[in-house]
Amino acid sequence: MSAFARRNPPGIIWIEATIVAEIHIKHLGGFMIKLKKLSAIALAAVMAASALTGCGSKKNKSTVTTTPTDLSDEQTTTVDTSKETSSDAKDDSNSEKSFGLTQKTADGTILQCFSWSFNTIKDSLEDIALAGYSTIQTSPVNACYNGGDAGIDLNGSGKWYYHYQPTDWTIGNYQLGTKEEFKSMCEEADKYGIKVIVDVVPNHTTKSTEALGEGLLNAVGGIDNLYHKKGKDEVSNYKDRGECTHQAVGGLFDVNTENIAFQNYFINYMNECIACGADGFRFDTAKHIGLPDDPVEDSSMPNTFWTNVLSKLDNKDNLFIYGEVLQDGGDRIADYIDTLGAATASSYGYTIRGALQTGNLDVRNLTNYGIGNAKPNIVTWVESHDNYTGDDATYSKITNEDIVLGWTVLAAQKTGTPLFFSRPYNASSDLIWGTFNKIGMSGDYLYKNSAITAANRFRNAMAGEEQNIFNPSDSTSVIFIERGKKGLAIVNASIKPYEFNVETNLADGEYKDRVSGNTYTVKDGKISGTIENKSTIILYNDGYLEFAPAAIVKVDDSVTGSYNTDSIEVKLHVENATEGEYSVDGASPVAYKDNDTITIGAGKNSQETTTLKLTAVNEAGNKTAMTYIFRKQATLTGSIEVTFVKPDSWGDKVYAYVYDETTKAPTVIENAAWPGVEMEHVEGNKYKYTFEKNWEGYEPLIIFNDSNNQSNAAMEPGENVINGKEYTCN
C-alpha cells in the first residue's frame, strides 16, 4: 500500500521531512486523492547533531534508558530480545545445498521480492541463498485487477499496485504467474532451505466490482454481503477504530471480514498457498481488520476474523505470520503483535532513515523501537515499498550507500526480523522505476551487494546470541553492535573516517572483516582500528562460511528497457565466470563473453516485448540468472489523438499534460506548463486531445487532470502515449 498525492511537476522534488508515523491516504490503485501534507522540522529536530569523530576511549558497560539526558559518557544498552513468534523451522542443512541459513524466519533476514514473477524468484534462489537471506516474500499472489491493457510496467501501461486490488482469492495472476509456477517456485526454495512468505490482502477488493470473480461472489452470498455497510466510504479519522476497520482505504472497498462465509473462503485460499509450499504470511492493512474487542457493525457478526482464520490454517505452528500495522497512535500495535505473532515497526523505519540522513546513530534512538511495552516481535526495515513509492519518496532521499549502513544496523541486531525491500532494477534518485520499469524482473543488484551479504551472513551466524549496542564516548555517528562473545558489527555514518579503541566482549585474537577482508586484533579485551567514512565492518570467526563470489550477469547500465528503432543493440557483461549464456524469447542459449554486443527486437510491433535471459556459473558451480524485458515503443510521428473518460467527481475542465524527462531529453520536454493543455469535450465524460508538438525521438508520458485531481498517483510517471488510445483513471 502507498500514499497518494498529486504528482510533483517534473524537476521538482519535495525536500520537507515528516515525523508522522503514517500517511493515511493510501495508494491502492485509485486515482488522485488530495493529501493534507504534514510537514515538520527535519529529523534533526528529533535527533542530536552528529558528534565529533576521533579516537575512542573506555566503554561504559552500564545499561541506559531509551531517553536519557546525560551525554557525558559512552551510551550502551543491552536489550531483552526474547521472541515468541512461530517456529517456522526449515533447516537448510537438510537441503540439497547448504548456505548457512537460519531455520527460523525470525532469526534471519527476509528479501521482499517486490513485483518479481514466480519464475524470476525461482531463477534467483541460488543468488538469494548466497546473499544470506533465509526467507523471501512475494508480492500478492491472488487474482488481481487487470488494468492498463494488462500491461506489465511497474507504472505506466499496468501498475504494481494492481497486486493489492484483489478480484478473487485464488492463486495466480497475469502479473506474477500461475498457480503451477508458484508451486514450482516454492519447491525450488525448499532445496535451498529458503522459506516463502506470501503477502495476503483480505481487507479490500478492487473498486472495479465488475471484475470480481464469480466464485468469490457465490461463496459470500452475493456482492451485497461482500462489503461493510460503509465499505465504499473513505476513512477520515484513522484513530476511530470503527471507521478504520469498516471503511475504504485509498478508494478500495472494505471487505466485511466478519462474514463467516468470506472467512471460510479466505481460509481455503491461504491453505492452498500452504499446500503449494508457503511458510508464512504478511497480512496487508492488518490494522484495518478488527480485533475481537473493536467496534462491530452488526451485533450478529462479531470480530472473529483473526480468531477463526489463524486457528484454521494448516501447519499453523510452523508458519511465520506478521501484520502490516502502520503506526499513528491509534494502531493498537501491541494487540496486533499478541494476536498475529508479529507486526511491522513502521515508526522505527522513520527512526532509521532519520539517523541515516543526519549521520546520527545515537544508541538511545536506535534501541527505541517505537512499540512501547509490546513484545519485540517486529519486522524492521530501512524502507518499505510504501516509503519508496509513496509520499515519503525514499527513492530520492535514501541512497544505496545509506541502505547498506541502515541494513547493517538492522541485520546485526537480535531485535526484530529485518526485511530488505528490493528496489526496481537500476533505480536511482532520478528514476524511481529504474531503467526498465517492468513487473516480473528481479530488483536492483544491491540486494546481493557484498556488504549486504556480509550483514546477512553475520546475522545467520549470530542466531541466539544476545546483543550489546553502544556508541563510543566521542561520537554518535559510529555504532558498535556486539552479539554475545561471538561477533561485532561496526557502522560509521559520518563523512569522516573514525579511529576506535574500545572494550569488547570478543575473545582475544584476530578477526577478519567480512566486508573488506582486513584483519583486526582484540588484545586484553580491547579492539582498535579505523573504520572508513560511510562504511561497515563485520567481525566474526565462529560460524563463518566461505563461498565463492557469485557470478554476475547484466546488460550495460546504458541500456534501457524501451526502444523506438527497429531493433536495439545490447552490450552484455559477465563477472566471476569465464563466460555467460544468453537466450532471446526462449530460444536455445548462446555463449557470450564480457562486453559482447548483440542485437535484439527486430521486426517487433509497437508495444511488443522481447525477453532476454542471461545466465552464468561461478567457480563453485553456483548458477546465477537475470531476465530483462524490452518493449518496442513506436516513434510518434504525424497527427496523434487520444481520448480520456473522466470520473464523475471531476470538474468539467480537463487537461492533458504531456512530458518527457528521460535521459534522452536534456531537459524536461512538455506540451505546456502544469496542468497542461485543456482537452476538447466530446460527449458525456469523454474528452480528446490532439497533439500539436512533434514528439519524434522522445518517449512522452501523459497525465490527465482537472488541476485538482489527476489520473496517476503520487510521484509516479504518467502513462505511455499511444495514438488512438482511450484512457481512464483505472
Where do the PLM segments sit?
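Aromatic- and acidic-residue-enriched carbohydrate-binding clefts of CAZyme catalytic domains
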Residues: 91-94, 104-108, 144-187, 221-254
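Low-complexity, disordered linker/stalk regions enriched in Pro/Thr/Ser/Gly
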Residues: 546-636
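Sec-dependent signal peptide cleavage junction
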Residues: 51-69
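Short, Lys/Arg-enriched N-terminal segments with co-localized hydrophobic residues
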Residues: 3, 11-31
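Short proline/glycine-enriched turn/loop motifs at strand-loop junctions of beta-rich domains
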Residues: 414, 495, 504-509, 573-579, ...
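Active-site-proximal helices and loops of the catalytic beta/alpha 8
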Residues: 89-107, 123-129, 140, 145-164, ...
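Exposed beta-strand face motif in extracellular beta-rich ectodomains
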Residues: 537, 608-612, 697-702
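Aromatic-rich carbohydrate-binding modules that target alpha-glucans
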Residues: 589-595, 647-696, 707-717
